[in-house]
Amino acid sequence: MRFILLIALVFAVLDGINCQIAGGLSDVNASEYTGAAWNSVPEINSKNNGQNYMVPIKVVKAQVQVVAGTNTVLEVLVGESTCPRQGSVQASQVTAANCPLKSGGKRELYKVSIWEKPWENFKQTKAEKIRGVKPDEKI
């Protein structure tokens, strides 16, 4: 009897390794979340006190969790743009076309969390700086 229970336990553990935890974060294709990164520019820049706006360079990592809605967690590499914060462009108007990346500008890594409940017309975005990124650092 113990042998059967042991075999059942081994199979349960091996099966659990190959499946995802219900309600847990699941890795997704980061390149598909570039638009979400650009939509988070106002929140990222509310945490930034530099002279110029920060803009996404690339999404380094993306994860999605389905609970009461969808929670998307991104790691976004951002860089200093050519647009001054005190200029005519507001953070909500920043795009790749009107605020290009500044050559040699400051770079940082941010964690962006986006919680959405479409049936309630609810969307909440939070951003927090993880760390600065050195100019020669590969990410």
Curated annotation (Swiss-Prot):
This protein's UniProt keywords: Disulfide bond, Glycoprotein, Protease inhibitor, Signal, Thiol protease inhibitor
Residues in coiled coil: none
Transmembrane region(s): none
Gene Ontology molecular-function annotations: cysteine-type endopeptidase inhibitor activity
Keyword Ubl conjugation part of the UniProt annotation: no
GO cellular component: cytoplasm; extracellular space; vesicle
SMART domains for this protein: CY
Pfam families: Cystatin
SS bond list: 83-99
Domain of life assignment: Eukaryota
Keyword match Iron: no
Site positions (Reactive site): 23
Entry-listed glycosylation sites: 29
Residues spanned by motif Secondary area of contact: 65-69
Signal sequence interval, chain numbering: 1-19
Functional note: Cysteine protease inhibitor which inhibits members of the peptidase C1 family. Does not inhibit asparaginyl endopeptidase. May play a protective role against exogenous cysteine proteases derived from soil bacteria or fungi, or rotting fruits and vegetation.
Family: Belongs to the cystatin family.
Name assigned to this protein: Cystatin cpi-1
